[in-house]
Amino acid sequence: MFQSRMENVISSFYLEEDTTQNKLVEDAYLNAELYNQQLFLDQKREKYDTILNLTSTQIMATIQIPVIDVDLAIYHGTSDEVLNRGIGHFEFSSLPVGGKNSHCILTGHRGMPSAKLFTRLDELKKKDRIYIHVCKKTLVYEVVDSFVVEPEDILDMGIEEGQDLLSLVTCTPYGINTKRLVVKAKRIFPKKKVQPRKSYSIRELLFLMIPVVFLIVFKVVKR
C-alpha cells in the first residue's frame, strides 16, 4: 500500500518536473547550489522551504538505492509527518544538489509496519551506489563507510572542505532504536552513462496528468 502510494507521488513529481520549463529548473538548481555555498561559508539558512520546491508534491528530490530496493521521495525537514511519508532532509545540512564543500544528510525510519523505508540500510557495503534525482539531473554517490553514533552526534556531522558527501541516517539497533546508523557516501562521476530515472510514454503521461490537473483546478476554484 505504502509503496504503491510512493510510486504514484514520485511519478507525479517527475511529470511536473519534466513539464516545467528548463530555465526554471536550472534556476532552482543554481539557487540550491548558492544556498549550499552560503551554508559552508557562514552557516546561514535562508528561505530553506522555498528552495527545491518546484512542484505541488512538495518533493525536493528522490533517492534510489538499487541494491536494497529503495526508491523514495525526499522532503524538506525531519518532522514526524515527513518521516511517515518518505525520507527527510536535515535542515542544517547541504541540499541534495552536490558540489564541492557540501554534505547532504538524509534520514528515514526503519522497521515501520507499513513501509520499509531505510530498514535495509545496514546491508549497504563499500562501493554500493546511491542515486539522487534532482532538477532533471542524476547524481551518483558511492558508499565509503558506515558507523554507529549517538543521536546527538548527527548534529556534529559537518561539511568537509573540498568534499561532496552524502550521509544516510536511520535508527539502530533494529527495534531498539537507541543509536543511529550512518552510511557515508562520496560523489563519483562514472565513465559509463548513468541509467536515468524512469521516463514515461505518452499514454502514461496522460494518465498521470489527471490528478495533477485536478489539483490545479481545485486550487483555482478554492481561491
Predicted regions and their residues:
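Juxtamembrane interface at the cytosolic side of transmembrane helices
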Residues: 213-223
